[in-house]
Curated annotation (Swiss-Prot):
InterPro entries: EIF3F/CSN6-like_C, JAMM/MPN+_dom, MPN, MPN_CSN6. This is COP9 signalosome complex subunit 6. GO terms for cellular component: COP9 signalosome; cytoplasm. The keyword Nucleus applies. Residues 32-165 form the MPN domain. Transmembrane segments: none annotated. The keyword Nucleus applies. Component of the COP9 signalosome complex (CSN), a complex involved in various cellular and developmental processes. The CSN complex is an essential regulator of the ubiquitin (Ubl) conjugation pathway by mediating the deneddylation of the cullin subunits of E3 ligase complexes, leading to modify the Ubl ligase activity. GO terms for molecular function: metallopeptidase activity. Belongs to the peptidase M67A family. CSN6 subfamily. Keywords: Cytoplasm, Nucleus, Signalosome. It is found in: Cytoplasm; Nucleus. It comes from Xenopus laevis (African clawed frog). Disulfide bonds: none annotated.
Amino acid sequence: MAAAASNGNGMEVDVAALPSVMAQGVTGSVTVALHPLVILNISDHWIRMRSQEGRPMQVIGALIGKQEGRNIEVMNSFELLSQINDEKITINKEYYYTKEEQFKQVFKDMEFLGWYTTGGTPDPSDIHVHKQVCEIIESPLFLKLNPMTKHTDLPVSVYESVIDIVNGEATMLLAELSYTLATEEAERIGVDHVARMTATGSGENSTVAEHLIAQHSAIKMLHSRVRLILEYVRAAEGGEVPFNHEILREASALCHCLPVLSTDKFKTDFYDQCNDVGLMSYLGTITKTCNTMNQFVNKFNILYDRQGIGRRMRGLFF
């Protein structure tokens, strides 16, 4: 019985019936460094499409980065438009060229390196799309992410195309490349929240988010209780409700239970923090004052130039 798998468009594909597109015994010609931001972008793209369509969908996008000789660094990505004609995917090249102009304005030192998609093992439909990308760039990379896998390993594979003789004909095949993960300082900070996902299987909240939610709930409850006590004390002082000495004693005991720090270290840290906050406020005020002064000088220069022109014009008649 032949195995069946989804091709990412909601259709079942007979895997055994598809011809193999993988090259055997071929060593990669380049080294690839992959940034986590690319994986996050692809995952976000796939999740959004699944939410919009209500079922898993295959997504396609472009890879950008830097290349120096045989070393390729995939640093970012963006989405591509595509359509299905006769069960074959066709890339919207006009959309790509528009996006290319836009990303070159922002990322001037990056170039188009290849494309990505989602799904399982590469099949002939991937070769069909890869040939279209080859019309844009020579020897593009091909990255495929499998979002449905249950393995703990990173479900990402990177390929390059090779030409081999199959049944006497030149055929484009894919050779898998090994890759390493490369991160920058800003990127590590950005993905730290995602990296701290809990192992409960829900994947909805991270450990940091759960801790902050618990703290927020506790502080919210404390605030409501303190506000209730304060309202009672004010009402008792105003004669709206009778004095309950037991409640007042408990409120007084609660106030005396609050920690009072008077150590030298606390005073030093407190004054340092106050100085930092005051300095930030002072710098903000100075910046605002400089901006106001700059606007005043500009308006003064405009007015002075106009008066100078008026005096010169009057001098022509006397």
